[in-house]
Amino acid sequence: MPLNAAMVGTSAEPVVHTIDARWLMAYAAGLGETLPCYLDTRRPEGLQAHPLFPVCVEWLAVLGMRDHAGAFGLTAEEALRTVHATHDLVLHRGVRPGDTLTTRATVVGVEQRKPGAFQWCALRC
């Protein structure tokens, strides 16, 4: 599966999400969380998102990068066989109900590795 270095700098269309309490609670419950900060809407401080919740708003941006695969030499079948190998998440503040987040995915690097091609995408919210 070849990756063309010309794809560096390519960005997917921005994805906009409005965060609501129900989504935050559903995510936390899906992880088996029981802490009130993730589930109790009556808390004076309100709900907070689980620290891994941002993957929810990143995923559609990642999928949006597949729309560019053909322009850089990947077939649709190859694009579907890609593997998410690693994830580095930096939170500058917690996500709260009512937040509107815009996520942008941009290819920031490609290289050949023993198992195949490797691509880095930066996801910014």
Predicted regions and their residues:
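Hot-dog-fold acyl-thioester-processing enzymes
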Residues: 1-84
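Hydrophobic beta-sheet segments that form the core/acyl-binding groove
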Residues: 82-125
